[in-house]
């Protein structure tokens, strides 16, 4: 598939739930959350059909996200089903790691080669302050077990002024002894109504400057095709570093991805308000061809970049959008 700006679309991010067992303040409020009802959520059968249609249209990679995907019952059976889709080249998962460790051998058998692990700090007390849950040991256990099973690990850390700036260098230090990719992400205004977010102070330039102060030999390395991050390596380190300009939005020109929320809404940009409810089409009995045509029409009316897309959006929580 190609959009109206000539960008190839071959990557789908599918959020299977809006629920999460952590309460990271930048993602969702700690209390007063309006969870989606079971009726509003797509069933796994509906998701499988949508994924099958998408793969036939040219989607080669599917990332499973949430909320936290592993809190939804039946997720492993669903992963088994989509792993059998002919033409799908890669399945990846974004998880907070709390429930993941016992499932890693099965994930390996399913052919999962890469997992993104959300980890904003290496300090247990700060972890609790950010997530409101004391689950730091479980997340670290997941990281080490993923590496033991030869599954690529990307650590995603949201950089927040006054919250975890002191963790930037310790997280970079992880790459010295471990073959992990540590990715620092600009904070985005998707906390579902919490007013803590004011203005971005730590952009991708400032993050890199902070790292360079401690690691002056850091080198820029080639970014993979369609990469959302600026990628770096420190000589002598086993891992790498990425900086994602999520708020600055400097990667829109090569964006190859679309999102589907837990309630089946297609988002052709993280920042748009949703452009098509695919779940409704499925429940209305539309054929695969009709759904494909609706998807193509939506992709052919895609915003040029996140700034244009944001003009029509409302700031939902990241859990509801699909992290």
Stretch-by-stretch model annotation:
Residues 156, 183-187, 222, 243-244:
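Short, conserved beta-strand edge motifs with alternating hydrophobic and charged residues
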Residues 4-42, 270:
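Canonical Radical SAM [4Fe-4S] cluster-binding loop centered on the CxxxCxxC motif
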Residues 16, 20, 64, 93, ...:
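Conserved, mostly hydrophobic/aromatic
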Residues 191-307:
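Accessory C-terminal segments flanking Radical SAM cores
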Residues 32-37, 123-130, 191-195, 277-278:
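A short acidic, helix-capping loop that chelates divalent metal ions and anchors anionic groups
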Residues 1-15, 23-25, 56, 229-244, ...:
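N-terminal [4Fe-4S]-dependent radical SAM core
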Residues 22, 124-125, 250, 276:
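Glycine-centered loop/turn positions within well-structured domains
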Residues 41-64, 68-185:
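Radical SAM/AdoMet-radical enzyme domain recognition
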């Amino acid at each position: 598939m190609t959009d109206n700006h000539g960008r190839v679309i071959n990557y789908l991010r599918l959020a299977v739930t809006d629920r999460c067992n952590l309460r990271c303040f930048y993602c969702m409020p700690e209390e007063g959350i309006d969870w989606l009802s079971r009726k509003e959520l797509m069933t796994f059968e509906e998701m499988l059909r949508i994924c099958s249609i998408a793969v036939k249209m040219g989607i080669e990679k599917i990332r499973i996200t949430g909320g936290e995907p592993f809190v939804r019952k039946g997720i492993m059976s669903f992963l088994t089903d989509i792993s059998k889709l002919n033409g799908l080249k890669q399945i990846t998962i974004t998880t907070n790691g709390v429930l993941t460790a016992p499932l890693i051998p099965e994930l390996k058998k399913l052919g999962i080669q890469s997992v993104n692990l959300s980890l904003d700090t290496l300090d247990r007390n700060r972890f609790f302050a950010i997530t409101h849950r004391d689950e730091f040991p479980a997340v670290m256990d997941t990281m080490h077990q993923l590496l033991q099973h030869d599954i690529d690990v990307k650590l995603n850390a949201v950089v927040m002024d006054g919250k975890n700036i002191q963790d930037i260098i310790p997280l970079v230090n992880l790459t010295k002894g471990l073959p992990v990719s540590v990715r620092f992400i600009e904070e985005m205004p998707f906390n579902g109504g919490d007013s803590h977010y004011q203005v971005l102070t730590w952009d991708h330039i400032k993050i890199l400057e902070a790292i360079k102060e401690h690691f002056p030999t850091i080198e820029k390395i080639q970014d993979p095709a369609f990469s959302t991050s600026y990628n770096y390596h420190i000589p002598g380190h086993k891992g790498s570093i990425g900086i994602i300009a999520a708020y600055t939005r400097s990667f829109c020109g090569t964006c190859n991805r679309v999102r589907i929320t837990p309630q089946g809404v297609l988002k052709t940009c993280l920042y748009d308000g949703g452009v098509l409810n695919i779940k409704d089409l499925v429940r209305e009995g539309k054929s695969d061809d009709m759904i494909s045509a609706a998807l193509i029409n939506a992709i052919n009316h895609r915003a040029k970049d996140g700034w244009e897309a944001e003009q029509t959006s409302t700031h939902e929580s990241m859990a509801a959008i699909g992290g």
